[in-house]
């Protein structure tokens, strides 16, 4: 039983669920563009997301300040799970990437470079990590579709980036105590702006997402921006951890389900 619980916890903490949500958002973007994602782009998105987030988990084992904290101590003691899933994710992404044009691969390598900066200089990037996360997600979800980059497509990419940033900002509130203990020199958005300003910034991102969705004719985007705003308003220092995980890990798939549920 303990072994089974350990594996369930490994899968949860290894962000398999985030990779599934990334795939859901990729499918949503395809529907907005009138395209159907094939297995190639799906492999890149799912495998790439799984690789990156497990690489971040695997990196923690070399950080003495972070690994000493009880929140990540379990991850450090089971780092081989993250290592295995990281390699599996890389293999899945590589299989899909083999069928993509060179021009698309070059852009994806730019995203990989941004992730490397985030991983290598985690303490130095501080508040910039939120922007890096949003930009990288937007690139990975949209670029594989090989677009001509019309105005609507550019606005869609901006909307996705803001949506991800809006989801990430509340998690900065959730992580502020851990960040202060594990990375005393790192100044995140919450450390620089304060909790209330961070919440307002997150809501501002969702307001812009709603406005861009209105312009692009995406009713589901307007609905999800309102839902996310409601969840963000409930965030504070004592908010249960499950609230943050549902907000971050559930809203991407929820957006796709809302899109499918609408009668048009």
PLM regions and their residue ranges:
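Small-residue-rich segments of transmembrane alpha-helices in multi-pass membrane proteins
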Residues: 20-25, 73-85, 131-147, 190-198, ...
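Solvent-exposed interhelical
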Residues: 45, 49-84, 165-206
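Extended hydrophobic alpha-helices typical of membrane-associated regions
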Residues: 69-71, 222-264
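Membrane-embedded alpha-helical segments that form the functional core of polytopic membrane enzymes
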Residues: 37-55, 107-113, 152-170
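Helix-coil boundary and interhelical linker segments in multi-pass alpha-helical membrane proteins
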Residues: 24-45, 93-106, 141-158, 210-219, ...
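Intramembrane alpha-helical segments
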Residues: 73-146, 232-234
């Amino acid at each position: 039983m303990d072994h089974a619980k350990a594996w369930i916890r490994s899968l949860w903490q290894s962000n398999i669920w985030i990779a599934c949500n990334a795939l859901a958002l990729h499918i949503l973007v395809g529907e907005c563009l009138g395209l159907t994602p094939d297995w190639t782009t799906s492999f890149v998105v799912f495998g790439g997301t799984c690789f990156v987030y497990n690489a971040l988990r695997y990196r923690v084992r070399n950080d003495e300040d972070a690994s000493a904290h009880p929140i990540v101590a379990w991850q450090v003691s089971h780092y081989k799970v993250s290592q295995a899933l990281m390699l599996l994710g890389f293999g899945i992404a590589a299989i899909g990437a083999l069928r993509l044009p060179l021009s698309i691969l070059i852009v994806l390598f730019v995203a990989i470079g941004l992730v490397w900066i985030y991983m290598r200089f985690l303490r130095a990037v501080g508040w910039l990590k939120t922007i890096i996360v949003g930009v990288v997600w937007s690139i990975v979800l949209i670029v594989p579709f090989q677009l001509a980059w019309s105005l609507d497509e550019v606005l869609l990419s901006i909307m996705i980036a803001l949506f991800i940033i809006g989801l990430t900002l509340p998690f900065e509130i959730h992580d502020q105590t851990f960040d202060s203990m594990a990375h005393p020199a790192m100044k995140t958005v919450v450390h620089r702006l304060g909790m209330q300003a961070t919440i307002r910034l997150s809501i501002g991102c969702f307001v812009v997402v709603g406005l861009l969705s209105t312009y692009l004719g995406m009713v589901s985007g307007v609905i999800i921006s309102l839902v996310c705003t409601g969840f963000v308003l409930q965030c504070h220092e004592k908010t249960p951890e499950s609230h943050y995980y549902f907000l971050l890990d559930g809203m991407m798939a929820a957006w796709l389900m809302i899109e499918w549920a609408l009668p048009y």
